[in-house]
Amino acid sequence: MFRAIAIIRAHEVIDAVPASHIVLERDERHLRRKAITLENGEKILADFAEPVVLEHGDRLVLDDGREIEIRAASEELYEIRGRDPRHIAELAWHIGNRHLAAQIETDHIFILRDHVIRVMLEGLGATVTDVVAIFSPLRGAYSGGHQHHHGHDHDHGHHGHDHDHHHPDHE
């Protein structure tokens, strides 16, 4: 089984035709070590030192030099629109406050479908439409793959009250 040993980001791809491709949903595009079956039926092993997030158009470089194109799957999403840019920002805040993955554009937001969230957003005045599209949400503050050390606990005001919590992964 050939191994994927490097990534070429979509904006760095030169016009070479890929040897094959694979279609992956958002959750499947976040990986570190995983066997993957390509569209041509061949199996490869993605084998990276750290977790990576693959985006539509990225290429995996195999240990034999071939390039495999990543294609983002179309997924069932909500397209959320607000009255104006400020309203969209408020809606984005509510979505982020619930720790939901979101693709935020200038005039709309995409999220994975969830009926409870739809009711909440409509209650906040949003127009919510069912769509099927590629989902490329923003990566969170902790998804950069770097390590940092705090050496202390945090006090956070959250949900109208203060509470302490400790980050054992940062020690």
UniProtKB/Swiss-Prot annotation:
Entry keyword set: Chaperone, Cytoplasm, Nickel, Nickel insertion, Virulence
GO molecular function per UniProt: nickel cation binding; unfolded protein binding
Start-end of Basic and acidic residues biased regions: 152-171
GO cellular component, one term: cytoplasm
Keyword Plastid in record: no
Family affiliation: Belongs to the UreE family.
Identification of the protein by name: Urease accessory protein UreE 1
Origin species: Brucella abortus (strain 2308)
